[in-house]
């Protein structure tokens, strides 16, 4: 009873402020709205329910992931006709196990559209997970993953990535993309850390906005043939699993949910996002697919958003089979649809349709709820222009797979790679440096690209790209001397166990080190995705640790090249290496970008988008509470200590030193709600190399009615500096950007002082008047 009362109070707080009527997130288009009403009014209940069903492509043919690369997907057209006639499904998703060529995608999606138009009068809405380029189009150039995009701290890079991905998708006749991923990567062990931008809400929100604009363009009501509908995911707090394992429960306070986890989705919707995918797990004991407060009150009503909500894979039936809050499949459908789900990624259980029809006829799901859901689906199809142009064709996309997208992939990788250590300025290397390349990540494309790369787990990359440039290839391309190679440890390329290693010959690597000047040690992770990427130990593998220690023991300098989707702990040996270069998952052009940084053709400019942990039992984020800083002084509290991490959020070195000076408040040193604050700082490139450099602005509340974060990122900008050049960098903020969410679920801006920080400089601001806001600022 006590637990039930707590949940009731929490649910009440969730609704605070939601009764307001904000302006529409997307301004309605009168013509589109008239068409929506006309179409929905003309549909039968069976047709409406069919539109709410999304089926997987392998429902109509055999998965080809384990077949030779030249194997074709064979459509069972008889089955397609039968299912379309009987259930009138409105959407299809996925590739048949691995990537298809654009020449295959075009007629495949066209066939679905032809059948759907014949049976329902509406085109199919085809969805795909193209999260870093056209990931399911054969041999498509792949951008770095989202974690790299955030590490670039460059908004323009992110928008370009999305724009070019959209172009490649439409060339393949694919109009709807399940991207961006907006979960906050605040659990270091989580297997989808690399799919997300950052642990930070502000950075994630800024990148979310740019990615949605890149995918969709500037007019969400009229998506042209070069853009796609975005689908930010996984609403909400999916990455906050208590266990650190995928698809497991999260327990998150109301203020943190509202202030941090909601922020990227709000930014995406303000940018015009047309659909949202739901978190597969639960928050505070309530499966998100069953959470009316989050799906309807927060998202649809609170933001006055008329977009469409789609489930993740099988997640309605999971309310019954896994979450145990429904008595059977039918009951699970009732719960999810009434919570606010509009489309079910069923993906094979077509009984969804007759069961939902029964629920409507029994009065357990209202006709109004069905009409609302179908209106949102039809509206999305109209906004995509699918009624007038259901198909797009490769012949109309001359830049497909061209030099422009390959250059953009390279640029994104080059701006994201992060230099974390450079003892004695060992980097960059001269081209005639004698090097040994070692480690399991040295001569494979798969780890460079990560999951969702031509297949779900990314295990097909090296077969799809037999001539792809690996780190070893790129280093050889840059070196003028003979480059030695001895892996020492290799991945077994096991599809089901990404951590499987073999061919251990550390002594061979040690022997190969004789006569070289520097060792380039390529360590990290193989590719993985979702639950198969779960781990129980944050440390990098024992074999890789042993290899690192053995090479360090030779006395030759070691440059560690990290290629991993999350920050695996390396504290057992990192002090022994001379330099650390973090590549994350840099994509198909990433190896060349990394090598160009190693040899000084590119100056590294990436910064960590998350906190790189040092110890497995001392995990934290940069915006921790001050009371968490409890290192040093054994047996006593030391309130002046710092959190022990390997490298902090926002950390990143360059080959040129930068100097900050004269941090000042230009306007608004004393402010209240409604005021503008302008801050300036002088930044100088003190070196002899030109460089790009991200300037980060942190502001924290010195005293607040709830414990304030130690720091909060409030703005950033990336600027190019010539050698020796100085620039004044200005930031402009609204006073409301310094507000926080209190225990009541509302936003508050409180009277008192704030500390500004840029690099190692600080200054003060003073708020002169407390203001209490509602649900939204």
Predicted regions mapped to residue ranges:
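Glycoside hydrolase catalytic-domain context in secreted enzymes
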Residues: 18-741, 748-762, 768-769, 774-777
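Bacterial Sec-dependent N-terminal signal peptides
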Residues: 1-26
